[in-house]
Amino acid sequence: MTRKPLLIFLLTLFLTALQVQWAGPADGHDAGTVSLLSPEVLGAYPGVLLLFLLAVFARRHMPLLRQAAICTGLLAVYWLLANYVTFDARVASWSTYTPLEIWTHVLPASVISIAACGAAFFCASWLILRETRWNKRG
């Protein structure tokens, strides 16, 4: 395995865990229902998806900025859905929230964390992808 996919995967795991914990409710709600090792928090699902997409993009010779932008957009959507699941498990399960009410809580809480982690992922993944010294040597 080359270093680029491994670095992208580890970056995805780290930033997903950071983003979901940052955006999650932390004030007196049941934090035990969603652990740090739960699938939506850990980020293994988007990590595998992004590795597959990057392999497809590489075969199509897509520009690196476009690759990083598409992967960042998909990851941001995943993070928003993970925040929804986390809020639903920690807060909404103890009360009667409609899906619209959950979204009104999740969207404002997610904007800053998704923007910051998305910018970090975009820049880091673009730098990783454009680096040629990490290419597999035959």
What kind of region is each of these model predictions?
Residues 5, 92-137:
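Alpha-helical membrane-associated segments of multi-pass integral membrane proteins
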Residues 42-65, 69:
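Canonical alpha-helical transmembrane segments
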Residues 24-44, 80-110:
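Interfacial non-cytosolic loop connecting adjacent transmembrane helices
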Residues 13-17, 51-52, 73-77, 117-124:
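Hydrophobic core of alpha-helical transmembrane segments in multi-pass integral membrane proteins
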Residues 26-27, 62, 85, 89-90, ...:
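Membrane-interfacial segments
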Residues 47, 66-91, 113-116:
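Hydrophobic alpha-helical membrane segments
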Residues 8, 36-40, 70-75:
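Alpha-helical transmembrane segments of multi-pass membrane proteins, especially transporters
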Residues 3-19:
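Alpha-helical transmembrane segments
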